[in-house]
């Protein structure tokens, strides 16, 4: 009996401790308790999400590799450019920006290394020529269109002739400024090559509601052509235009001067005639002098005339001889 009581005592104690632990635990609503099937479904969803993420990563890698292969060219220059770009990026990371105390930073002359780097950057650039610019397209829209092929540095578009624009507006055309041709500079040659090969002879595309959806671009990559060549060409054209304007202006001034001189002479002659009329009355018009010209006939000299003269002299001499 004593043993049974002891066992009951310890069992009650354990039961009481279990009940106390259950009381300490917070009450949980059975509606929010997940069943075993729900937990298994969540685990399956997590596994599926992980698989999808891995697939997305692999697809991104594949697309990245595809675009890298599409952007690469067969030339060895592009590979060298990539290596040089990586070296330049590492050098820029190593360099730290220098803080200037003064607000106005003094411009320092470039060193030989900086000049060499600048020349290397210029040698990597590529220029694309556009023989036609779609209507209502400005440099900003063209830059947005070309940025999908690579980094665009500079863009220059030739505006329409003001006279042609006035005629177009007079006939009911759009008042917006139009452009006839243009050039775009890319930081890398491969960007320019892919841009020219993709856009040349093809529609711009994009959204069907866009105003340039069906416009066709004419693009050409200019090998061994740099932006400095374009600036020199434009400067030469402006110089020739100014020289032509100077010659036209000088010719117009000469014509005006001759017209003014002849006008002054005619006015002076008119004033002189009026003064003579006031002083001596009406001036009688003097008859114009007749010009007498004498014309003298030149003597003819020919072999036939000389032969006839000799025959005449011989016949006259024979007659005189017979008479004498």
From Swiss-Prot:
Acidic residues composition-biased segments: 37-53, 75-92
SUPFAM superfamilies linked to this entry: RNA-binding domain, RBD (SSF54928)
GO CC term (a single one): nucleolus
Domain RRM: residue ranges: 126-216
Ranges annotated as biased composition (Polar residues): 248-263
GO BP term, pick one: endonucleolytic cleavage in 5'-ETS of tricistronic rRNA transcript (SSU-rRNA, 5.8S rRNA, LSU-rRNA)
InterPro entries: ABT1/Esf2 (IPR039119), ABT1/ESF2_RRM (IPR034353), Nucleotide-bd_a/b_plait_sf (IPR012677), RBD_domain_sf (IPR035979)
S-S bridge residues: none
Keyword presence, DNA damage: no
Signal peptide start-end: none
UniProt entry keywords in alphabetical sequence: Nucleus, Ribosome biogenesis, RNA-binding, rRNA processing
Biased composition (Basic and acidic residues): 64-74, 264-296, 304-313
GO terms assigned for molecular function: ATPase activator activity; RNA binding
Gene3D superfamilies (UniProt xref): 3.30.70.330
Localization annotation: Nucleus, Nucleolus
Principal subcellular localisation of the protein: nucleus
Region (Disordered): 1-116, 248-324
CDD domains, per the entry: RRM_ABT1_like
Family: Belongs to the ESF2/ABP1 family.
Function comment: Involved in the small subunit (SSU) processome assembly and function, and in the 18S rRNA synthesis. Required for the early cleavages at sites A0, A1 and A2.
Name recorded for this polypeptide: Pre-rRNA-processing protein ESF2
Source lineage: Eukaryota, Fungi, Dikarya, Ascomycota, Saccharomycotina
């Amino acid at each position: 009996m004593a043993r049974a009581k002891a066992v009951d005592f310890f069992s009650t104690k354990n039961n009481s401790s279990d009940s106390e632990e259950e009381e300490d635990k917070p009450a949980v609503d059975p509606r929010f308790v997940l069943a075993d099937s729900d937990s298994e479904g969540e685990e399956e969803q997590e596994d599926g999400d992980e698989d999808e993420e891995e697939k997305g990563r692999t697809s991104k890698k594949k697309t990245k590799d595809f675009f890298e292969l599409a952007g690469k060219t067969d030339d060895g220059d592009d590979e060298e450019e990539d290596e040089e770009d990586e070296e330049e990026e590492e050098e820029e990371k190593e360099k730290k920006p220098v803080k200037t105390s003064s607000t106005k930073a003094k411009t320092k002359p470039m060193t030989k290394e900086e000049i060499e780097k600048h020349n290397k950057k210029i040698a990597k650039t590529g220029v694309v020529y556009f023989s036609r610019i779609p209507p209502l397209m400005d440099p900003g829209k063209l830059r947005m269109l070309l940025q999908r092929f690579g980094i665009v540095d500079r863009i220059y578009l030739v505006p329409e002739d003001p006279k042609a624009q006035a005629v177009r507006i007079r006939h009911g055309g759009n008042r917006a400024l139009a452009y006839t041709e243009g050039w775009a500079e890319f930081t890398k040659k491969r960007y320019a090559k892919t841009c020219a090969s993709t856009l040349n002879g093809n529609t711009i595309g994009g959204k069907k509601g866009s105003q340039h959806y069906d416009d066709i671009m004419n693009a050409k990559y200019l090998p061994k052509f740099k932006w400095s060549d374009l600036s020199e060409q434009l400067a030469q054209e402006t110089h020739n235009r100014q020289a032509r304007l100077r010659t036209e202006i000088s010719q117009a001034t000469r014509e005006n001067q001759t017209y003014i001189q002849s006008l002054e002479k005619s006015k002076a002659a008119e004033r002189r005639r009026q003064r003579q009329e006031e002083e001596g009355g009406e001036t009688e018009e003097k008859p114009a002098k007749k010009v007498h010209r004498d014309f003298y006939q030149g003597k003819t000299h020919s072999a036939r005339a000389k032969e006839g003269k000799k025959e005449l002299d011989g016949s006259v001499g024979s007659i005189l001889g017979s008479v004498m």
